[in-house]
Amino acid sequence: EELTELRSLYTRAAKSLRNSRRLHEKITALQIVNEDNSLSEMEELFSQGEYNDVIISGLVFDEKLTELRSLWERACDIQYSYRKLMETAQSQHGIKYDNALLSKLEKLFNEGDYKGVIRNGEELEAGLNQLVDSQIEAEALKSEFEQKRNELQQLVESCSEKGDTRDHSA
């Protein structure tokens, strides 16, 4: 019975280690920066027959890597969204925005600071959205001003045609 228990524990530990390796390989293939060395620690525990510790470490390791991948995906989305917003701001509204800010996001990303990318990217995106909204509002006000000026010009011309001699050159 003790042998059966040990075999079951061994099998669960081996499965946990195998799953953690697969997840680690996926993270590595995506070039996600991961400085966690828990996998080698798990392998060491396994070689020492510490199967319970391997199982527990595997659960924690998998949870950390899953969270890391989630952060990485969110950081990718933020960078993409910010880049597209910058392109739109430049092409549709003529807004010139500092590319150094995008470079800063890329630097944080390459260093594996995905939380920093998310935090800074969301702030930059909000600021750029506000700038675009202000530009749209300014364009609308300019258009309204041009329309009122044209109406006034037409009124002045109409008065001039009717022989009104008052000065309408305001």
List each language-model region with its residue ranges.
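Long, charged/polar, soluble alpha-helical segments
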Residues: 1-170
